[in-house]
A protein has these predicted regions:
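Conserved Helicase C-terminal RecA-like lobe
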Residues: 1-120, 190-191
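SF2 helicase/translocase ATPase core recognition
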Residues: 80, 92, 107-190
Length: 191
């Protein structure tokens, strides 16, 4: 019953953390990007985005992963990204948004998916990276929509990082089916 579901959820969470970076699961050890294909891909994407003098938002559902990405990107790219998360005060959040939107030197903002999901206008970003998958595709879309506000005049590239050969591929298939069903329900309801 409930106990079994709790154990399954813990297992899934552990597997997701391992896909993100082994350090997130182990809570100790090396934090090198080389230990995670996903971290390596994220760094490569961010470096390419920076080379094009563009800005990016990186969404993760885990604050610990945001902390780790901040460390890795600082080491690999030479500048510290902003990190917008639920523990920040309202003035701190407002400052981060203002700085990201108006400071040409501030190119990367990491956001915890829940904290960065509603009411934000981050149209200076031309790239969105979803580092890990959320169970509800609408939450992911809402996060992406931060860049599609009034005033956005550029194309926005959305990158979803999924570790090949893992259960993340199955989660992605499930999410796509769930989204198709939701889209169909909306379409049918509009008739």
């Amino acid at each position: 019953g409930v106990n079994r579901r709790g154990n399954i959820f813990k297992l899934i969470t552990a597997l997701k953390q391992i896909c993100n970076h082994p350090y997130q699961f182990l809570k100790s050890g090396e934090t090198s990007k080389e230990l995670s294909g996903k971290a390596e891909k994220c760094v490569s994407l961010v470096q390419s985005i920076l080379d094009n003098n563009e800005k990016t938002l990186i969404f993760t559902q885990y604050k610990e992963m945001g902390d780790l990405l901040t460390k890795i990107l600082c080491e690999e790219c030479g500048s510290e990204p902003s990190f917008f998360h639920g523990s920040l005060t309202v003035p701190q959040r407002e400052h981060l948004i203002e700085d990201f939107q108006n400071n040409d030197d501030r190119k990367v903002m990491i956001l915890s998916l829940k904290a960065g999901g509603t009411g934000l206008n981050l149209t200076s970003a031309t790239n969105v990276i979803h580092y890990d998958l959320w169970w509800n595709p609408a939450v992911e879309e809402q996060a992406t929509d931060r860049t599609y506000r009034i005033g956005q005049d550029k194309n926005v590239m959305v990158h979803r990082l999924i570790t090949l050969g893992t259960f993340e591929e199955k989660i992605d298939e499930m999410l796509k089916a769930k989204k198709e069903l939701a889209d169909l329900a909306v379409y049918e309801g509009e008739k």
